[in-house]
UniProtKB/Swiss-Prot annotation:
Keywords from the named record: Cell cycle, Cell division, Cyclin, Phosphoprotein
SUPFAM superfamilies: Cyclin-like
Membrane spanning stretches: none
Keyword Electron transport in annotation: no
Residue spans of biased composition, Basic and acidic residues class: 349-380, 389-414, 474-512, 538-556, 563-579
One protein family per Pfam: Cyclin_N
Residue stretches of biased makeup (Polar residues): 11-20, 306-334
Domain of life according to the entry: Eukaryota
Protein name according to UniProt: Cyclin-T1-5
GO terms for MF: cyclin-dependent protein serine/threonine kinase regulator activity
Example GO biological process: cell division
Length: 579
């Protein structure tokens, strides 16, 4: 780094305090840190040293993640972290990654940002925390940095780096952020202020990992963040007469589109093929201090329709693959070149995908209520969702079943950063499992239907029994009306004693008094009638009526017999007289 310091003296000599400049020079000072995207990507010093765009993009995300972690451990505000990140972006626009250790420069930028934003942290604390993060794979790092020799070496490295950063930036430490214009604009909208502000704030924080701050002014970035947040939340931003909302930011539609597209590109870049191996192992995301486990899922009608979707996954520990730091690196460059990889990546979900999954979930719960107890909401954090080829991907966390169309499609799943396609054999197994689950669900529905049918049959039987009871009462009423008239059918009851009745087979059955016998009634009806038997008064009345009927029949029979004997006697006497 001493060579870098010597080579940058021209920047130090040209640095002049800002109070001696006039307003025109101040305007030039602000505008000199904004460049075209082509210039940033094609003409950077790193490109001249053989580092391609993809590698530089990865390195940019890496030091952003490192600064986010460092700032959170030092407990500095998010604005201070953002200032440190912008210092780094500006430094590496003029310096090459091949000649400077990005984490040493990032540590210097955090130390400077604390002083610029009036939230300073002692140099000793900055060095201790930085050393522990960089050497996190070394369990004895926290003890090594307490050694005087190691600490003095790191202190000298940071102080020399501070001179290099100041000279490279031309001692221009004025930085403006999108946070203030964003909050002021949302206050005017008066539409879902809390949710809109939080999501837009997250977009601004994620945008720090890109080169947007070198291309667009802060209020342009704020407009792009609000635009994406409104699309994500499906909120219609108000217009003041003929003036639309984005005109508040003095931004053109072209600029708004560019900012939005570059923010969305960041999420697409999180999917990096494993074939890049040692060069770029994975995409390292810069987490947000203001984003406590929130899950960003962004979609816009204009820009996101054709975007590739990816699940939220955690980044992996990085190995020592980056060797572009030069021979002059200090102890900070010995272990774990990619130490900032603890933060989680937040990727974009397509709006149509989210709506489809929600619809499938609701349909499944309506048709299978038994599964409702097992449903869990998707966690709002960045836990890794890694699926293997042999895993049943048709069964989701809430017990949801994908439709046949979704199961038949070949899907890419994340295993680390590699993209693995499922084989036809695995898909066949998935189809069989889905089919078995559906058959099981149908059986459950069938059992519920049968139970309902049984209940309906019970109701019908009960109604029939009520009708039988009414019929019995009608028969009793008719019987009372014809008590005085003789009936030929009553001859079957002759010869019975004490209410004993002969059935069809000639067997004697003891029946309850006052109970009517019906050979066609089933045993269930008999039991029903016993439960619903006549009260004692009716039973005694029936007994008296039965006895009287038997007496009348006996009397009529005896009287008929006596009359018949008299007639025979008279006829016999007359025949004797004639003879």
């Amino acid at each position: 780094m001493a060579g870098v310091l010597a080579g940058e003296c021209s920047y130090s000599e040209s640095g002049v305090s800002s109070h001696s400049r006039n307003s025109h020079e101040k305007q030039e000072e602000v505008s000199r840190w904004y460049f075209g995207r082509k210039e940033i990507e094609e003409n950077s010093p790193s490109r001249l040293d053989g580092i391609d765009l993809k590698k530089e993009t990865y390195l940019r995300k890496s030091y952003c993640t490192f600064l986010q972690d460092l700032g959170m451990r030092l407990k500095v505000p998010q604005v201070t972290i953002a200032t440190a990140i912008i210092f780094c972006h500006r430094f590496f626009f003029r310096q090459s990654h091949a000649k400077n250790d990005r984490r040493t420069i990032a540590t210097v930028c955090m130390f400077l940002a604390g002083k610029v934003e009036e939230t300073p942290r002692p140099l000793k604390d900055v060095i201790f925390v930085s050393y522990e993060i960089i050497n996190k794979k070394d369990p004895g790092a926290s003890q090594k940095i307490k050694q005087k020799e190691v600490y003095e070496q790191q202190k000298e490295l940071i102080l020399n780096g501070e001179k290099i950063v100041l000279s490279t930036l031309g001692f221009d430490l004025n930085v403006y952020h999108p946070y203030k214009p964003l909050v002021e604009a949302i206050k005017k909208f008066k539409v879902a202020q809390n949710a809109l502000a939080q999501v837009a704030w997250n977009f601004v924080n994620d945008g720090l990992r890109t080169s947007l701050c070198l291309q667009f002014k802060p209020h342009h970035i704020a407009a792009g963040a609000i635009f994406l947040a409104a699309k994500f939340l499906k909120v219609k931003l108000p217009s003041d007469g003929e003036k639309v909302w984005w005109q508040e930011f003095d931004v053109t539609p072209r600029q708004l589109e560019d900012v939005s597209n570059q923010m969305l590109e960041l999420y697409e870049q999180n999917r990096v093929p494993a074939s890049q191996g040692s060069e770029v192992e994975s995409s390292v995301g810069g987490g947000s201090a203001q984003r406590p486990g929130s899950r960003n899922a962004v979609s816009t009608d204009e820009h996101v329709g054709s975007r590739q979707t990816s699940s939220v996954r955690s980044t992996h520990e990085q190995s020592n693959s980056d060797n572009h730091g030069g021979s002059s690196k200090g102890v900070l460059n010995q272990n774990n070149e990619n130490g900032g990889g603890e933060a989680a990546n937040v990727s974009v979900d397509n709006k149509e995908e989210i709506e489809r999954e929600t619809k499938e979930s609701s349909l499944h719960l309506e048709s299978h209520p038994a599964h409702k107890d097992n449903v869990r909401e998707a966690p709002h954090n960045s836990r890794p969702l890694v699926e293997g080829p042999g895993k049943d991907n048709s069964e989701r966390e809430g017990g949801e079943l994908q439709d046949d169309g979704a199961v038949h499609k070949s899907r890419n799943v994340d295993v680390g950063d590699a993209l693995i396609s499922q084989s036809p054999k695995d898909l066949k197994l998935l189809r069989d499992k889905v089919k078995a689950k559906r058959e099981k669900a149908k059986k459950l529905l069938g059992e519920r239907t049968r139970k309902k049918d049984l209940m309906d049959e019970d109701d019908l039987i009960e109604r029939e029994l009520e009708d039988v009871q009414l019929a019995v009462e009608d028969e009793k009423t008719k019987e009372r009306k014809v008590q005085s008239r003789p009936k030929a059918e009553n001859s079957d009851l002759m010869g019975t004693e004490h209410g004993e009745i002969l059935d069809v087979k000639g067997e004697v059955k003891n029946t309850e008094e006052g109970e009517m016998v019906n050979n066609n009634v089933s045993p269930m009806m008999h039991s029903r009638k016993r439960k619903m038997g006549s009260p004692p008064e009716k039973q005694s009345e029936g007994k008296r009526r039965h006895n009287s009927e038997n007496g009348e029949e006996s009397h009529k029979t005896s009287r008929g017999s006596s009359h018949h004997g008299d007639r025979e006697h008279r006829r016999h006497s007359q025949e004797n007289n004639h003879s």
